[in-house]
Amino acid sequence: MKTTNDFPTINERPPEGRKDDGSSFRVLVVDDSMFVAKQLGQILSSEGYEIVATAADGKEGVDKYKELCPNVDLVTMDNTMPKMDGITALEQIMAIDKNAKVVMVSALGKEELVKKSLMTGAKSYIIKPLDRKKVLERIAKVLQ
């Protein structure tokens, strides 16, 4: 005999880091700061996101995106990195996949840099230091 507890509630939905089918959103984290990459990874994985790879510079990030595409749902991208900056990496990722979902994560919050990132194809911009609530809200909104 079924009880009312056997049925999902109307407001029941998957955790933020999971798709409707229950699988995890897959994230590529690109940041030259190992501390920030680890912190971002912990925030996201604690909510069900799967960190599929990390990269320490823009060139490595683009290479990993090419390797993993289409199995990446989201890229987080720092702006200031060695070898290749975040805007250049963003341009290259958008050339590979015009539907790529990239969120810039940077200590630089200058208005012109934010605008350039968004005009280049970034879906959102998060300013460091990382605030757990803001990170999760922005990323969830991009993945809706």
Model features per residue range: what roles?
Residues 1-26, 133-144:
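Non-catalytic signal-transmission and effector/linker regions of two-component phosphorelay proteins
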Residues 34-53:
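Two-component/phosphorelay signaling modules centered on CheY-like receiver
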Residues 88, 109-124:
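Alpha4 helix (beta4-alpha4-beta5 surface) of REC/receiver domains from two-component response regulators
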Residues 128:
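A Lys-centered signature of the CheY-like receiver
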Residues 69-76:
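Active-site beta3 strand of CheY-like receiver
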